[in-house]
Amino acid sequence: MISVLITLSGGMLAGEPFGVNLACGDFGSVFPGEYNRHYTYPTDADLVYWQQKGLMLVRLPFRWERLQHKPYGPLCQDDLAKVKDFVKAAGKRGMKVLFDMHNYCRRIDEGTEKIVGTPELSYESYGQFWRMMAQEFRGFGNIYGYGLMNEPHDLPASVSWHKMAQVAIDSIRTVDTKTPIVVGGYHWSSARRWVQMSDNLKTLRDPAGNLIFEAHCYFDFDGSGTYKFTYEQEEGTPKRGVELVRPFVEWLNKNNLRGIIGEYGIPEGDERWEKTLDNFLSYLQKNGVPALYWASGPWWTDAVMTIPTYRGGKEKPQIKIMEKYKETK
């Protein structure tokens, strides 16, 4: 069941669901690619496990090139139908979906990478895509938010992520004034560097007053989430996650804004990371900030942080921590 939301101080909400990324729509390096060869989308079967665990929010990564084959062109009806089927399936289970354009402020057309905000790929083409998506999904009651862009980073000096986000916000609000809009931070959405890299996002204007800010937080020494080294070499401590996410949480509270951790994760094999994770999720829960684990989905195998849900009933150790934190307080 979906909890009733109660406003808290600092812009945070109680009853906000925690959840998981079901990543597979962003897979592959061929664009738009062939469905079920280069990429796929999760289905109702991928929701069963997470519903049973009470983790009721799903972040759904997708690639712009697959839902719209050419800038300013129509939406791809085949992919759109598959995404709608997934959103409907989630809704029947009382689960919410956060869209995630997993494009890093870029898209690849005919093998050539283009950056939004350059002459090759205008801000307006990006806004037009989001206007059409909002037109298609504004009637769904279980859209947690339109996630404008995954991990903006390394843009040329002539390009502004702030402007890009504002164009998308303005475009969406021409057709949908109710659904939240989720804005990722600059520099890979880093929670630890949020104030240095993303402070200007607080000046974004939303006529609906319904923005949520998204940060990512991995606990290894460089924040990449690769966890290549030992706990000690990665500078692990029980409170490391709390220390890394605190700049973002304090920024939210200071500016009376809402937030979410769109990605976090730990490796298995060293129980000390589990204590770090427990402290991290406890801190977020108490501060009204939900979080989404990276990652699960139908094509994942045993990568460093992933949680495949098909391994003969054997659960990964992260689960016993995650299922303690189902919603914010």
Would you name each region that the model predicts?
Residues 28-35, 64-81, 105-121, 226-231, ...:
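Surface-exposed, active-site-proximal loop segments in enzymatic domains
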Residues 291-295:
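His/Asp/Glu-enriched short active-site or ligand-binding loop at hydrolase and phosphoryl-transfer sites
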Residues 59-62, 98, 260-261:
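Well-ordered alpha-helical segments within folded domains of soluble proteins
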Residues 23-28, 57, 63-68, 103-106, ...:
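Solvent-exposed loop/turn segments at secondary-structure junctions
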Residues 5-59, 321-324:
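N-terminal carbohydrate-binding accessory modules
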Residues 38-57, 72-103, 107-145, 161-173:
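An active-site-proximal structural segment forming one wall of the substrate-binding cleft
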Residues 35, 39-40, 124-145, 149-290, ...:
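Extracellular glycoside hydrolase catalytic/binding regions
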